[in-house]
Curated annotation (Swiss-Prot):
A GO molecular-function descriptor: glucan exo-1,3-beta-glucosidase activity
Gene: EXG2
GO BP of this protein: cell wall organization; glucan catabolic process
Residues cleaved off as propeptide: 457-479
Family stated for the protein in its record: Belongs to the glycosyl hydrolase 5 (cellulase A) family.
Alphabetized UniProt keyword annotations: Cell membrane, Cell wall biogenesis/degradation, Glycoprotein, Glycosidase, GPI-anchor, Hydrolase, Lipoprotein, Membrane, Secreted, Signal
Any one GO cellular component localisation term in the record: side of membrane
Organism: Candida albicans (strain SC5314 / ATCC MYA-2876)
Name used for this protein in its record: Glucan 1,3-beta-glucosidase 2
Amino acid sequence: MMLFLIHLMALCCMFVAEVACEQFNSTSNSSSAQSSLIDFQYKGVSIGGWLVLEPYITPSLFNATLSSGETWTDLPVDEYHFCEKLGAKEAEKRLTDHWESMYNETDFKQIKEAGLNMVRIPIGYWSFEKLEGDPYVSGAQDYLDKAIEWSHANDLKVMIDLHGAPNTQNGFDNSGLRNLGYPGWQNKTEYVNHTYKVLQQMFQKYGTGKYASDYKNTIIGIEVLNEPLNPNMDKLKEFYIESYNDGREIQVINNTIFFQEAFQPIGYWDSFLEKGEIKVTETSNGTNHTTTKKADFKNIIIDHHHYEVFTESQVASNVSTHLENIKNYASAIGKEKAKAIVGEWSAALTDCAPWLNGVGLGSRYEGTAPYTNDRVGSCAEFNKSPDKWSKKQKKDYRRFVEMQLYEYSTNSQGWIFWCWKTEGATEWDFRALVKNGIMPQPLDNYKYVKNGTDTSSASAIASNKMTLLLAFLLVILVI
């Protein structure tokens, strides 16, 4: 009987070990076909809140606009209204101080030391050419040029990202002009044509001459527009074709041109990139004329953005659900025909960072206006200094970060974290996450994720199975 039990226990241990091994070693092969296409594996970070203001990244800039007797209702909600409130002279002074102080070459050295190999630098159209009547001030372009030099000196690639278009392409404050729910970029041909004009200037400056010769191995490409929301898709496709053709005609270097997904489903852009054409109907003198716009797309990357905090169901999810969401999302990208990156993601498990949703707006996590969902919890636990976070909080964040690092690296051409640093929004702050042991160093130094499996969860499953088996053995012994 004893010999039988020993054999049974050995078999049980082998079974549990096999279960754990299967869980730990499971991996997706969906990117194997894509891997041969990869020329450069992106491990990057966005320089957010610098050349295009975002209130939650640098709230001090916005708070400093208040005069005696004013309240938060008098705060500007974006860069457009920041400049309008202060006037051109004062806005230029404050923005120049901001551009000078927020980033310098030391930051780019630290970015390299953190294991990153590229930066994505957002900039607005107004930094190249304003529209008549715009309150924006110029000057940020000079700091983009400095950032390219700093990147070159520290062996970092640069993606230049047109983050704001005239009359806002998405209504978000990160476009320069907040008008939630009412992006107006496509409302007038003038706005789209002005965007073409700005892109042509960008292609001319950064794709020819000095930059083409001295920085051709630094400037990896240009993203023609960030996050267009609810556009007329045929018009957006026309814009992508025309922008691409301008880029290839003007530039003397064959760098990458990035198309942002425009919040479309994964795989949406595959057929468009394969066909490289769109039929366009124009009206002239009361008569409709249909033409076909074409492009021979080469060296295109689709830029996907993914966050887990901008719906009520997401902020109510537990960490295990978030991890499963990431696995499913990345697996779908791995099946895309187009080359793709996850060009924005973060460590955020809540939308608690003050002003993340916009100046004067609350959070889904707390169910505060304008959100009407049930309260999930208190933001105080997440907005306190990360050195005061509990061990469980830090572990959960690290599990979430590790899963994204692994899955995006495995199933796409890489990733770009949003963003390098903030004044206090830790979930969005790569530098702070490194300092607090949440962002792995080196970047593949995973504690909890092994080959795409959350081992903390897998260990619990194996432990529970072992407990049940041992209980079964004890019953046999008693019998």
